[in-house]
Amino acid sequence: MGEVLLGIETSCDETAVAILTDSGEVFAHEVLSQVEHSAYGGVVPEIAARAHYDFLQVLVKKAMSNSGLKFDDLSSIAVTAGPGLVGSLIVGVMFAKAVSYATKKPIIAVNHLEAHALVARMNQEIVFPFLVLIVSGGHCQFMLAHDVGCYSKLGGAIDDSLGEAFDKVARMLGLGYPGGPAVECKAKNGRGDRFFFPRALHNRPGCDFSFSGLKTAVRYAIEREGPLDEEMVCDICASFQECVGDILVSRIRNAIKAARQLKEGIDKLVVTGGVASNGFLRTIISQCAEDMGVTAVFPPRELCTDNGIMVAWAGVENFRKGNAVASLGFAPRARWTMESIS
């Protein structure tokens, strides 16, 4: 059976637990999404932390029961230690430490962003070095992955993340939270050429992103058009997605060129994070990467959003590197960049 790891994820508003082997066989996977936040149009930190506290133990018990394993069968416990909402992180880290202490199993402090970056390697042949684009509610950045725990940042969002832009556009249109799936759904029935929104930094050097101007332009369009019918809502969503696609293509081209200047043989672009589940953007990104002689690789859609499998797999990768420790002295970190992992 090999090594077996328990993964715990509580960095934001998903409580997630998974049990898997070092060969990628998943014994259990439980995710609880907190619907309470939809009424507020975004994540409320106190509500998120309380929900983790109420349900994490329940999910772990359920996962252990479904797997047919006992805690003695585990090789290690992997837990997201940052970055994220500190209150939410504390719940997961303290629970994982308690399990580690009681079972005398080593514990691995997992970087949430690294977990997103590595999960595509679980069932696909991706060797280092490779380029990573993380696009989620809290992060938007290009990383060059040299090895487990070793990354260089090529660029990132200078204001809002892409996931945040999706959420705010959805909120302005009254589509609810989370915004990404809602906008994508409406865009399928809309015209992407109905509105032209600004492409910030488009065709300029560098690998940074800017989405604040795009959000403002969408707000102005909504105010200018007055009461919106269903057709108009769909057209705004489609035009917004078209704009995002153009921005990503421009930045990806630059990032691939920059990565190749630093490392020869870059032939994979891993695109991960919640926004990477968007089907329209997957198609645009795949074509752009192919044009640049690179293969775009996406995790399965259910592993793009926050989940326990990615944390457990990051634990596997770190376990192999000898990074599982018996010490319980680490603390959750609201800010923890990938380049500072090592």
UniProtKB/Swiss-Prot annotation:
Its EC number is 2.3.1.234. SUPFAM superfamilies: Actin-like ATPase domain. One of its GO terms (biological process) is tRNA threonylcarbamoyladenosine modification. PANTHER family: TRNA N6-ADENOSINE THREONYLCARBAMOYLTRANSFERASE (PTHR11735), TRNA N6-ADENOSINE THREONYLCARBAMOYLTRANSFERASE, MITOCHONDRIAL (PTHR11735:SF6). InterPro entries: ATPase_NBD, Gcp-like_dom, KAE1/TsaD, TsaD. The keyword Nucleus does not apply. It comes from Anaplasma phagocytophilum (strain HZ). The gene is tsaD. Keywords: Acyltransferase, Cytoplasm, Iron, Metal-binding, Transferase, tRNA processing. Its main location: cytoplasm. Belongs to the KAE1 / TsaD family. Fe cation binds at residues 112, 116, 306. This is tRNA N6-adenosine threonylcarbamoyltransferase.
